[in-house]
């Protein structure tokens, strides 16, 4: 493997840090090389995705499912979920982004804390523990905060889904009624415009899809017309995908993270037992049900996959109507990748190259994030594809 293909490891075992503002794990954000040349918007966005920003972000998230340990800002008018890193060379002053003290021409506006966070259910559960604001106007929730694959030998090495449960920042299971109550308040008080519902994987044949369907129905009764994306593993019974559509979901994410089976076995040992062929079956059926460009999957840059093969896999996904949401691997506190493996974020040159090439493929296919009705790819804040035009 070349240097671009190998996950970047820390050369020394860093001392653990419990500082609340060291959001990227011990020194992780400060470890990737800072690229200070060039003026392209994409290059700057890549740098920020890896280096983070020194900023007070009222809307932030630690641990949980998916990319986290970040703060939410509007960066040049686009939503961005950025590592909050006190060692970053990037800082915000008077609403402008500075690199080593120099204004680089981008407006930055931290997303304001939503009003619905101040409310609680009748039985005393904070709305913030039920669903979170992502970006300026997206409501997100993990409807089941546990995963059947969370034993250490099975767990995805980048995942912290149960860490937020352990630190009491969420609850294990969100009921349809709770989600409907929170969504109604978030729409009324804070103007949310779409919702994302993901779930830890359950042992049932539906892998949690049917609970998602119940939650979608309840939310749409409370907030008619709200665009909703659902996310789950490929269900053994693919009929569950139609049930999600019938419940009112407009788009779906079925996330594989890597198309390289060796990488999958190394990074996602439990999920890797679901074959890539099973993912293709689920994706193809989901495209039939939800439509082209309404089905997406995460592809993580920085797990060690050959970059040319990653782009080729993205091209195959695009050809079959699936949006490959390319995002950088982000070291998170409490994950095996950070605490045991000491893996660093990818090199900026790798993230830029892959994102630029995948964006070109998406643009050529007419599959843009703006064409997605709801979801992570529609938001785009965790990656740089929107900055690249896709």
Placement of each model-derived feature along the sequence:
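Auxiliary Fe-S-binding modules of radical SAM enzymes
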Residues: 1-99, 285, 289, 308-390
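N-terminal [4Fe-4S]-dependent radical SAM core
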Residues: 77-157, 161-172, 189, 373-382, ...
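Active-site-proximal loop/turn and secondary-structure-junction residues that shape catalytic pockets
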Residues: 143-147, 201-203, 232-236, 258-260, ...
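Short helix-capping segments at alpha-helix termini
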Residues: 220-225, 289-292, 365-367
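Conserved strand-turn element in the central/C-terminal portion of the radical SAM core barrel
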Residues: 227-235, 283-308, 327-331
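Catalytic cores of alpha/beta
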Residues: 236-246, 301-319
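Short Asp/Glu-rich motifs
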Residues: 240, 263-264, 306, 335-337
């Amino acid at each position: 493997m070349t240097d671009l293909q190998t996950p970047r490891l820390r050369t020394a075992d860093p001392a653990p840090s419990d500082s609340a503002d060291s959001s990227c794990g011990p020194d992780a954000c400060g470890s990737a090389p800072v690229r200070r040349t060039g003026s392209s918007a994409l290059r700057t966005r890549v740098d920020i995705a890896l280096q983070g920003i020194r900023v007070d972000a009222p809307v932030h998230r630690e641990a949980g499912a998916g990319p986290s340990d970040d703060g939410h800002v509007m960066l040049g008018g686009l939503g961005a979920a950025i590592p909050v890193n006190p060692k970053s060379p990037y800082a915000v002053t008077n609403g402008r982004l500075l690199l080593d003290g120099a204004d680089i021409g981008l407006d930055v506006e931290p997303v304001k804390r939503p009003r619905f966070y101040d409310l609680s259910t009748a039985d005393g559960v904070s709305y913030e523990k039920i669903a979170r604001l992502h970006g300026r106007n997206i409501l997100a929730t993990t409807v089941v905060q546990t995963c059947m694959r969370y034993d250490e030998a099975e767990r995805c090495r980048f995942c912290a889904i149960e860490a937020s449960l352990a630190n009491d920042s969420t609850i294990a299971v969100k009921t349809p009624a709770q989600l409907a109550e929170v969504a109604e308040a978030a729409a009324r008080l804070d103007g949310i415009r779409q919702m994302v519902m993901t779930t830890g994987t359950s042992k049932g044949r539906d892998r949690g899809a049917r609970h998602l369907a119940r939650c979608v129905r309840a939310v749409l009764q409370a907030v008619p017309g709200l665009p909703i994306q659902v996310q789950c593993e490929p269900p053994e019974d693919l009929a569950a995908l139609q049930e999600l559509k019938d419940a009112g979901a407009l788009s779906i994410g079925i996330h594989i993270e890597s198309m390289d089976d060796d990488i999958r076995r190394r990074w996602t040992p439990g999920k890797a037992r679901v074959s890539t062929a099973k993912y293709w079956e689920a994706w193809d059926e989901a495209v039939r049900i939800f439509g082209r460009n309404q089905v997406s999957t995460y592809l993580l840059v920085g797990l060690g996959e050959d970059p040319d093969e990653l782009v080729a896999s993205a091209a195959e996904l695009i050809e079959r109507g699936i949006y490959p949401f390319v995002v950088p691997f982000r070291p998170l506190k409490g994950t095996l990748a950070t605490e045991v493996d000491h893996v660093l974020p990818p090199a900026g040159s790798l993230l830029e190259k892959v994102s630029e090439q995948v964006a070109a493929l998406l643009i050529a296919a007419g599959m843009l994030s703006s064409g997605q009705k709801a979801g992570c790819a529609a938001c785009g804040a965790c990656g740089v594809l929107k900055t690249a035009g896709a």
